[in-house]
């Protein structure tokens, strides 16, 4: 059944190896999570979904998770690290923030996750890399109310250009 299929006590949601402006599709999520946690039948249940937020807002790249049973859930959200560079190692990208909180959730509740990606690298000898993406954990609502936000963790800064480290 539903509870038996999801007997894990912890799971890490990630960008599923996808980089760029868009998050993973549902097929990419299923493939990635089946490789990471093969004992879970990710493709045989409605636990993981993309679909839409309340049927109105397209959710491509969002990860929607259905809570398998009532309980207290600890959620850690990490912002992504900033991009690095190809030419110099005089500066390092910033690490993303980490935010942790506990929430009482009920079986069937849905949470939406937008998992930040590492910032793009600098491919120029005098350029800076991009900042890392933020990670958001939200209630399954198509509103902008602060009450619909569980956690937000900011992404890290990109690596400074070569000359910036000497000032």
Task: Set out the residue ranges of the language-model regions.
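Extended, low-complexity, turn-rich repeat/linker tracts enriched in Gly/Pro/Ser/Thr and Asp/Glu
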Residues: 81-85, 119-122
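A short beta-strand element within beta-rich, extracytoplasmic domains
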Residues: 71-81
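Extracellular beta-rich ligand/substrate-recognition surface
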Residues: 44-59, 88-95
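Boundary/junction segments of secreted and surface-exposed precursor proteins
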Residues: 2-36
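Extracellular and analogous surface-interaction loops
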Residues: 5, 49, 54-57, 62-73, ...
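Secretome/extracellular-domain signature
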Residues: 93-167
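Short, solvent-exposed loop/turn elements at domain surfaces
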Residues: 20-24, 83-86, 160-163
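Aromatic- and Gly/Pro-rich amphipathic surface segment
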Residues: 35-47
């Amino acid at each position: 059944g539903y509870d038996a299929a999801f007997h894990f006590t912890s799971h890490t949601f990630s960008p599923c190896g996808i980089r760029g402006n868009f998050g993973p599709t549902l097929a990419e999520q299923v493939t990635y999570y089946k490789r990471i946690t093969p004992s879970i039948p990710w493709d045989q249940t409605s636990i993981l979904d993309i679909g839409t937020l309340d049927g109105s807002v397209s959710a491509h790249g969002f990860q929607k998770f259905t809570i398998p049973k009532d309980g207290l859930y600890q959620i850690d959200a990490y912002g992504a690290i900033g991009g690095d560079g190809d030419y110099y190692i005089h500066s390092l990208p910033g690490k993303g923030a980490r935010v942790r909180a506990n929430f009482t959730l009920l079986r069937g509740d849905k949470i939406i996750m937008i998992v930040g990606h590492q910032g793009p690298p600098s491919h120029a000898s005098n350029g800076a890399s991009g900042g890392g993406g933020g990670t958001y954990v939200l209630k399954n609502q198509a509103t902008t109310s602060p009450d619909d936000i569980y956690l937000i963790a900011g992404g890290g800064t990109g690596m400074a250009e070569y000359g910036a480290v000497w000032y």
